Every structure is written in structure tokens, then in C-alpha cells.
């Protein structure tokens, strides 16, 4: 008999497992990383990006900037660690707090409740920066940007689309329905209306529809 602890959000359970029922224990492989504080790592990544201009070469004073962040169901991506550094870097580029908008990419999830936004982004950021939850069912705040080649109408969050630049932040991981996460997935599913996902068989068509919707936005 052995005991194993399972973690779920802020909760964990320890359960006994009989040896005869234990097939294997899967553990993550150790990865050697540079010794660096999280803030420093984020700042270095922003100032020395791979295959992209630096933030200071992308944004300009006077522009409205939207930071698109995951919602509380993706808390493990630790946006509270990197968002405040991104805001500092934007400030250094001449973008004041008043010209920054944070939109949580909820997709079809519910809006945040209680202290969830503060847990997601940190209390200081929530005090300083306007934060709104995307609502895919609120048609009054969706804007039509065209149709995909597959005939799907594409609607995106009007608050985000009203900004001069949208900076997408998220983890790049596999999603069981839509393929690998990343910038197009975040923008294509999590700030749109219901249509990219409604009535589509759970096949490659779903993924293609999502990416087509996201790409359509940037054309």
C-alpha cells in the first residue's frame, strides 16, 4: 500500500493505493533552467524575443494597447507573474496605464467572480488597469470582421478590436478540441462569439475553422 497526493487548484487529496492496483507513477522529467527570478526572465524575453521585434519597436506612445490574457481556468499559466512586467515595459515605452486594457479570454466560460481577477493578475494591476471579461454571448460588444473561406461569420470582442495593438499572452499547450494553444488559438476562440465552435464535428475542421477566424482578423 502506498499513498499518493493529487492536486486540483488550491485543493489536494491524499489517497491510499494498493500495490496490486498501481500500474505506474508518472512524474515530470527534470529540466535544467538558468537561475533567474521570474520577473527577470519575463523582462529578458520581452527585450530579446525570438523571431520578433522588441516591444519598444512595436508599440508607440498615444496608442491604445490591449493585453489579452487567459482566464482563471488557466491560472497555472501564472499571468500574475508576467502581466505586471509587461505593463512596466509598456509604461517604459510611453504607454500609460490609462491607455492599456486587459481582456480576459474567457471563450465560452463564465465571467470571473469574487477575487478571481485579483488572483489571476494581482491586486495592483487590477487597481491600475481596466480589466474586462470577454462575453461571447454579449452581441452588443462583438464586431463582425468578415467570414472565413469556410463560410463562418467571424465576430470578435469590440473592446479589443478598438485598440491599436493587441498583445496576446498564453501558454502553448495541447487542447483536446482545438489543437495546440498559442496566439491564433487564444484570439480565434477566446475573444470571439460562439460560432467557431458551434455545429462543427470534433475533427480537424474545428481547428481549421478556429485558425481561419483568427487569421481573418489580422488580414
Give residue ranges: language-model regions.
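N-terminal amphipathic/basic leader segments beginning at the initiator methionine
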Residues: 1-44
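Short helix/loop capping segments that flank catalytic or ligand/cofactor-binding pockets
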Residues: 14-16, 24-26, 76-77, 168-169, ...
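Glycine-rich phosphate/diphosphate-binding loops that line cofactor/substrate pockets in enzymes
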Residues: 50-66, 94-97
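Gly/Ser/Thr-rich loops at beta-strand to alpha-helix junctions
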Residues: 70-81, 106-112, 171-176
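Histidine-anchored nucleotide/phosphate-binding helix
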Residues: 75-95
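Short internal beta-strands
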Residues: 97-107
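An acidic, phosphate/nucleotide-engaging active-site surface
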Residues: 111-181
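Extended, low-polarity segments enriched in aliphatic/aromatic residues
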Residues: 184-219
Amino acid at each position: 500500500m502506498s499513498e499518493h497526493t493529487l492536486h486540483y487548484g488550491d485543493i489536494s487529496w491524499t489517497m491510499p493505493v494498493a500495490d496490486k492496483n498501481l500500474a505506474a507513477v508518472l512524474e515530470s522529467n527534470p529540466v535544467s533552467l538558468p537561475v533567474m527570478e521570474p520577473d527577470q526572465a519575463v523582462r529578458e524575453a520581452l527585450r530579446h524575443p525570438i523571431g520578433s521585434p522588441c516591444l519598444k519597436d512595436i508599440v508607440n506612445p498615444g496608442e491604445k494597447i490591449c493585453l489579452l490574457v487567459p482566464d482563471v481556468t488557466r491560472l497555472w499559466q501564472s499571468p500574475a507573474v508576467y502581466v505586471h512586467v509587461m505593463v512596466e515595459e509598456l509604461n517604459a515605452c510611453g504607454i500609460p496605464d490609462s491607455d492599456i486594457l486587459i481582456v480576459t479570454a474567457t471563450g465560452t466560460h463564465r465571467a470571473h467572480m469574487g477575487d478571481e481577477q485579483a488572483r489571476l493578475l494581482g491586486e495592483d494591476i487590477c487597481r491600475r488597469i481596466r480589466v474586462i471579461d470577454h462575453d461571447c454571448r454579449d452581441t452588443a460588444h462583438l464586431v463582425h470582421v468578415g467570414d472565413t473561406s469556410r463560410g463562418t461569420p467571424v465576430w470578435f470582442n469590440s473592446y479589443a478590436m478598438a485598440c491599436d495593438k493587441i498583445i496576446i499572452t498564453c501558454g502553448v499547450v495541447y487542447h483536446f478540441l482545438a489543437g495546440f494553444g498559442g496566439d491564433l488559438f487564444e484570439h480565434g476562440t477566446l475573444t470571439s462569439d460562439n460560432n467557431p465552435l458551434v455545429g462543427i464535428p470534433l475533427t480537424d475542421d474545428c481547428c481549421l475553422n478556429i485558425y481561419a477566424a483568427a487569421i481573418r482578423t489580422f488580414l
